[in-house]
Amino acid sequence: MKVIIDGDACPVKNILFNICEHHDLELILVHSIAHMSKGEQKIETIIVDNEAEAADIMIMNRTKAGDLVITADTGLAALVLGKRAFVLSPWGHFYTNDNIGSLLDRRYLNRKMMLQGGRVKGPKKRNKEDDHRFQQALESFLEKHLRNSSKQEGV
């Protein structure tokens, strides 16, 4: 399993760096050239053009069944689920086949309202509880999936 980060607006990169290093997991950060930063030497970093969907296309090309993708992009999440990979939001909520339809519907309705001049409430300001919820969800997921993969290897 590898962990792939949609890094253009990911507020939990440092948490991911630490946890993936602790579990010795392959970590890939994908972001546009507009979001380059220092301090990403320990992980594989893929920098794409600053074009619409360039990072999403690269993420889809690199994702395999069983991988974990971190993104807040509902459209990308739907595509990743189609590859039988797992998707976790930076708020610690998993996108699943059971909830993706309603999330896509909400995204569509919000976009429609904005195009008609309406206002759509954005996400709340991020706080430490959000980081904690994300870290707990990630650790729980990894504990379960790494344990299952080691059982399968021992069979």
Curated annotation (Swiss-Prot):
Pfam family, one: DUF188
Superkingdom field: Bacteria
NCBIfam families given in the database record: PRK00124.1 (NF001095)
Similarity-based family: Belongs to the UPF0178 family.
UniProt protein name: UPF0178 protein Amet_2995
